[in-house]
Regions:
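Modules that initiate DNA replication and primer synthesis
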Residues: 50, 54-90, 99-128, 147-149, ...
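Hydrophobic residues at beta-strand termini and immediately following loops
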Residues: 61, 95, 143
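Short, solvent-exposed coil/turn segments
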Residues: 54-56, 136, 163
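DNA replication initiation on ssDNA origins
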Residues: 1-57, 169-173
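A signal for specific C-terminal beta-sheet/loop modules enriched in small/flexible residues
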Residues: 14, 22, 26-27, 35, ...
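Short beta-strand
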Residues: 93-100, 131-136
Length: 173
């Protein structure tokens, strides 16, 4: 995906919108049919992730919360403003509500840190528990729609690979 337009088109297809709705109603098969994105690509043993030509300048991170927690609704309501409020420090490129129980964030990779160190750093900054199972660099994220309720923040730097241009519009919140 090389442009905002293509990204939004994939997220807003009729199938995607229907599958997000079904996934949120507990349909596991519908979740598996959602558009998948990989925001973290690093050289791995045996070469790069198939189809990748270089290391990504971003890191994707899951922020999942247990819906049975007594403070679940509060976390879901407050976290977006908190993350967007630290967008510069975090290097936020994308924030979306996940299909089920939390959020996905994408932020600028700190090249002096490993994948795990990047995830630990972001977890500390945001104030959430580090997901020890989230260190797999080939992890994909099931995307949601491009609605304002799902796609909460998107910076065009996500599509330029860290090389913003004068033509790049400002981030949309």
């Amino acid at each position: 995906v090389k442009s905002r337009e293509e990204y939004l088109r994939l997220r807003n297809s009729g199938n995607q919108i229907a599958n997000v709705s079904e996934a949120r109603n507990g349909n596991i098969e519908a979740k598996r049919d959602l558009v998948q994105m990989n925001y973290s690509c690093l050289p791995a043993s045996g070469g790069l992730l198939r189809g990748a030509t270089r290391q990504s300048n971003s890191v994707g991170m899951d922020l999942d919360f247990d819906p049975t927690r007594p403070d679940y609704d509060q976390l879901m309501a407050e976290l977006p403003a908190k993350v967007i409020g630290m967008k510069d420090e975090l290097g936020l490129l994308m924030l979306e509500r996940s299909a089920t129980k939390g959020f996905h964030i994408v932020f600028r990779r700190r090249t002096e840190m490993s994948q795990v160190e990047n995830l630990e750093w972001a977890s500390r900054l945001i104030g959430v528990e580090f997901d020890k199972g989230a260190k797999d660099i080939t992890r994909v994220f099931y995307t949601t729609t491009a609605s304002a309720d799902d796609l909460l923040f998107l910076d065009d730097e996500l599509f330029t690979g860290g090389e913003p241009t004068d033509e790049s519009p400002s981030a949309v919140q």
